[in-house]
Amino acid sequence: MAKIYRDGDASLDWLKGKTIAVIGYGIQGRAQALNLRDSGLDVIIGARRGGNSWEAARRDGFQVYEVGEAVAKADVVMMLIPDMEQPHVWREQVAPNLRKGAVVDFAHGFNIHYKLITPPPYVDVVMVAPKGPGKAVREEFLAGRGVPALVAVYQDYSGAALKYALAIAKGIGATRAGVIETTFAEETETDLIGEQVVLVGGLMELIKKGFEVLVEMGYQPEVAYFEVLNEAKLIMDLIWQRGIYGMLNGVSDTAKYGGLTVGPRVIDDEVKEKMRRAAARVKSGEFAKEWVEEYQRGAPRLRELMEKAKNHPIEAVGAEMRKLLFGP
């Protein structure tokens, strides 16, 4: 069973009197920085001078520095810029300025796990990965709750790396909900596999294929949209709130029977085997290598695929249907 930490298992004392540099002030960086400050901790921001993040952080009342200067001032460095920007920023601005004994925190294990970033031996390297977007991290904190998180230690120079990681988790509100101990490898691989075969790739293609089948059979695109996309949220909300079995108890008997008998024929063992192959590419590092090379070329294939997704017929129909639902 997974080890789960709660509020009582963590102490902010590990961070009291220390300077925390949040590198990046996007949605996740802003949420975590504000939560840490509201928890009574000393937070500064590292950003590009004159950029949108720089100005946003100043408006929120933070002291803002160039990344290298912020790192040099910090006892704790939180790497909250996008994954693919991190290696360059690390080499040029973070690594040369790290203090001996500093704690370096990541919100995702990608760069450490796939060796795109190699930390020096004289720092702690930890991960606190909220399992929700920055907006939820902030809103739940303000409501007196928290978003669950994963926590991991990659390098324990101080002998107290886990204590520091749990303190960060507490500072952003995650221990209110619960923090699960994991490893950088497990977090990275399960995150990528989940995105590819279920959350982004799987759901997206399931919805699109269902829409295509209904339209090809002569049904109105607008009706098809509601059946395969709009109502997907209602089902996912039930699953999120009650679990799969609870969802089944929340739909009609007709939906139960149809789903339980036809679902396994559509998502069958052949699909499961394809999922295994996709997961194996993640675990071997093949996907990471492909994505890094694509990014370094300027991501031409990604742009092409995004354009294709934008031009799928479900998008035009969806734009009109969302006007009905939410207004122009």
Curated annotation (Swiss-Prot):
Pfam families: KARI_C, KARI_N. One of its GO terms (biological process) is L-valine biosynthetic process. One of its GO terms (molecular function) is NADP binding. It comes from the Archaea. The active site is at H108. Mg(2+) 2 binds at D191, E227, E231. Binds 2 magnesium ions per subunit. It catalyses: (2R)-2,3-dihydroxy-3-methylbutanoate + NADP(+) = (2S)-2-acetolactate + NADPH + H(+); (2R,3R)-2,3-dihydroxy-3-methylpentanoate + NADP(+) = (S)-2-ethyl-2-hydroxy-3-oxobutanoate + NADPH + H(+). Disulfide bonds: none annotated. Mg(2+) 1 binds at D191, E195. Residues 2-182 form the KARI N-terminal Rossmann domain. It is an enzyme of class 1 (oxidoreductase). Its EC number is 1.1.1.86. The keyword Oxidoreductase applies. Substrate binds at S252. Gene3D superfamilies: 6.10.240.10, NAD(P)-binding Rossmann-like Domain. The keyword Membrane does not apply. Pathway: Amino-acid biosynthesis; L-isoleucine biosynthesis; L-isoleucine from 2-oxobutanoate: step 2/4; Amino-acid biosynthesis; L-valine biosynthesis; L-valine from pyruvate: step 2/4. InterPro entries: 6-PGluconate_DH-like_C_sf, KARI, KARI_C, KARI_N, KARI_prok, NAD(P)-bd_dom_sf. Signal peptide: none annotated. Involved in the biosynthesis of branched-chain amino acids (BCAA). Catalyzes an alkyl-migration followed by a ketol-acid reduction of (S)-2-acetolactate (S2AL) to yield (R)-2,3-dihydroxy-isovalerate. In the isomerase reaction, S2AL is rearranged via a Mg-dependent methyl migration to produce 3-hydroxy-3-methyl-2-ketobutyrate (HMKB). In the reductase reaction, this 2-ketoacid undergoes a metal-dependent reduction by NADPH to yield (R)-2,3-dihydroxy-isovalerate. PANTHER family: KETOL-ACID REDUCTOISOMERASE, MITOCHONDRIAL. This is Ketol-acid reductoisomerase (NADP(+)). The gene is ilvC.
